Amino acid sequence: MELSVAMYGLLCLLFSQAVPMCVPTDYTLYEERRECDFCVAINTTICMGFCYSRDSNMKELAGPRFLIQRGCTYDQVEYRTVILPGCPLHANPLFTYPVALSCHCGTCNTDSDECAHKASSGDGARCSKPLRHIYPYPGLNSYIHPN
């Protein structure tokens, strides 16, 4: 009995490394420009999940080899551009946003990715103007243009 419990625990420990914990996840961006008439909800995917990290509390003795800081970040990303509806002629109606195609656990590349989490205000308000939805599939409306 004890052996089967130990084997089950070992299998769970080994299997947890094979289960993807960092995956593309559906997310809605809200873009509102002062000069345009509408707030736009854009459905996309972002990288979200948990990655193994370790930070020793004895860095002075152990050195950097015990410091492992990884986050869930883009492996492959595609950028798409939408035309924001209700913008006047003098305003640029184009908005480009990332779509996560695949993700991995690794260090964040600050040259190309946003690596810090921005806290929301918590009031639940996303838009102050009327809302329009932009869909990720080009056939659903005429506002999206793939790059």
Swiss-Prot record:
PROSITE patterns: GLYCO_HORMONE_BETA_1, GLYCO_HORMONE_BETA_2. It is found in: Secreted. Coiled coil: none annotated. GO terms for biological process: G protein-coupled receptor signaling pathway. GO terms for molecular function: hormone activity. Glycans are attached at N43. Pfam families: Cys_knot. Disulfide bonds join C22-C72, C36-C87, C39-C127, C47-C103, C51-C105, C108-C115. The keyword Signal applies. One of its GO terms (cellular component) is cytoplasm. Pituitary gland. Higher levels seen in immature fishes than the mature fishes. InterPro entries: Cystine-knot_cytokine, Glyco_hormone_CN, Gonadotropin_bsu, Gonadotropin_bsu_CS. Residues 1-20 form the signal peptide. Keywords: Disulfide bond, Glycoprotein, Hormone, Secreted, Signal. Belongs to the glycoprotein hormones subunit beta family. Indispensable for the control of thyroid structure and metabolism. May play some role in the biological processes of the immature fishes. Heterodimer of a common alpha chain and a unique beta chain which confers biological specificity to thyrotropin, lutropin, follitropin and gonadotropin. This is Thyrotropin subunit beta.
